Amino acid sequence: MTSTIKDVAALSGFSIATVSRAINAPHTVGPDTLATIRAAIETLQFRPNPLGRQLRSDRTQLIGVILPTFANPVFTECLQGLDELASQAGFKLIVMTTEYDTARERHAIETLRAQRVEGLILTVADAHAHPLLDALDRDGLLYVLIHNDTPHRPSVAVDNRQAAYDGVSHLIARGHRRVLMLAGSLAASDRARQRHLGYAQALADHGLEPLPALEIDFNAPELPNAVLAHLTSKATRPTAIFCSNDLLAMVVMRGLRRAKFRVPDDISVLGFDGLAIGELLAPPLASVATPNREIGRSAWRRLAERRAGETHAAPALVLPHTVRDGGSVTAIGDALDTGCGNGHGPDGAHGLDTHD
């Protein structure tokens, strides 16, 4: 005979209403109660009818997740943290990617709303000026931003500007005076722009001149000529490169090696994200490390709190970052502060065509 919710209530010792809440809104039930009810459900092999539950409660147990890309492990690590807690709560995630395109962000939001998701967890190109987020606020669809650090919207992130400031200050403390920043498209990412502001502020606060940031495609197979031109000219050669993310730093380290530069003997490289794979490189990548999986977990908790009617005085949750030292950064002395290298670096292009 098929078990019913009454059977689960009788075996667990809780009311039918409590069992129903454990099934339909597990975040509203205490962990011990939830564990007891789930044990009874498994013992009885009770399987709720999902269609009937949706029709009765107008609930889908679906949460939409919008990420820029799966290519960057930052977002997949975050998704792992999200999925961990979503599964425990009995929810399913519908995940879409946007490739940092605002039109695709709009399409993703519209698609997920048509799927009747009960909330959104998302990263957008620019959270500070985003009419679609304003529309979600007006319509009452709950959401939490991840990696977008904006003080006026519900979000979970690190302080990107402060994190970059601390990373560049770490380079300065190691003796570097000419630090070049490489980034993807600054226009496509408010996070990259905040990191650039932190980079520039750190140098300015130490009485140093920020260099113009170079924007490159981290999917490109080779370092662009513009970067190589900086590195092969004694007048413009930096002693360290700060990359706006770890994937870019890995591309840079590969390009430097192919151009006969040694990291860190000829030039130091600092990334941003703290990806575990960076520690497997030779030399291990120094990086500003962010708690990516915990960002996902915290975003889920924030969304659950919003769905339960809880509010926070500060809608933005800022998680701590750390500067992870690594073999890709070395200390240099006063004689090296001019940015002319340590005597081992190349003085020319080494056969590379640095022109278009």
Language-model regions: role of each:
Residues 35, 46-119, 185, 196-203:
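Amphipathic helical "hinge" segments at domain boundaries
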Residues 68-77, 95-104, 156-166, 182-227, ...:
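Hinge/beta->alpha junction and helix N-cap segments in small-molecule ligand-binding domains
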Residues 1-60, 343-344, 353-356:
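N-terminal helix-turn-helix DNA-binding module of bacterial transcription factors
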Residues 15, 61, 118, 176-178, ...:
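Short acidic/polar active-site loop segments enriched in Thr and Asp
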Residues 100, 122-166, 247, 273-285, ...:
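Flexible loop/hinge segments that line or gate small-molecule binding clefts
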Residues 105-116, 223-236:
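Short, well-structured alpha-helical segments in soluble
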Residues 211, 225-356:
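Flexible loop/turn connectors
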